[in-house]
């Protein structure tokens, strides 16, 4: 296994995407804009209901940190993804997709069991609501992760969705210890308002004594800090991280370090599907930082890539599209 720039740990999920009405969300007690965990039987029932009344848009490999890692790799970085899939057809599809994107994985990721699935429900306003059956990924532990590449990586990236699993939190703790021992920077995303609302203790455990870079959106930031303004939330989050990035949907993002706080405007696009947008932002931002770009440039690239993800269905772009967008962005920067 060769050295990598980014070492990420997260859930492995296959997405099934549907266009749905707001009424459908209400009828099935699904809180718009959040992720809700469920069991296999309940998800199967929802899937049946979706097939009967809603518009199917397709299947895609997902998982928040995996989407981030794909963006990072497709832009030109090197990456490893630690996860857990079942020894089934979906598990093979999932790992094959990562490998095709140039992301390193390990055979230890495959276990007896069922690969996790996520029903991604996209409402008319492009917001994504998710119902997730974690399957075997709920039991992700250090045993499924090869930590050797972490020792020489530049970044460890952790998704907040892992806050619901005790074994995953233990794996993250081990990863954090290795990262700190080898001078590897740590990035964490809060992932979802539902994680802040229902798994705060788990998030606190992932955050531990702080990180180098924290990603969140405006709602997550204010919920986690129990504040009513982005500015107050930012001030509190800076107590936990050297760099804080708060995304503001179409309005862009606020990025803050010990030296400066900047605000970068959004990019006007026709929003179709918000699924994976924040993940793409994080992957693009990390890639730009890792290649030596400043915060302003990193945020501008991240907004470009994430806005393209929003303008189509599915959590990821085609691999070649990331590279083309980067080329166009660099030409504009040099002009």
Give the label of every model feature segment:
Residues 155-232, 251-253:
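Conserved beta-alpha-beta core of the PfkB/ribokinase-like small-molecule kinase fold
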Residues 108-110, 120-166:
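Conserved phosphate-binding/catalytic loop of the ribokinase/pfkB sugar-kinase fold
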Residues 1-13, 18-19, 27-37, 53, ...:
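Conserved phosphate-binding/catalytic region of the ribokinase-like
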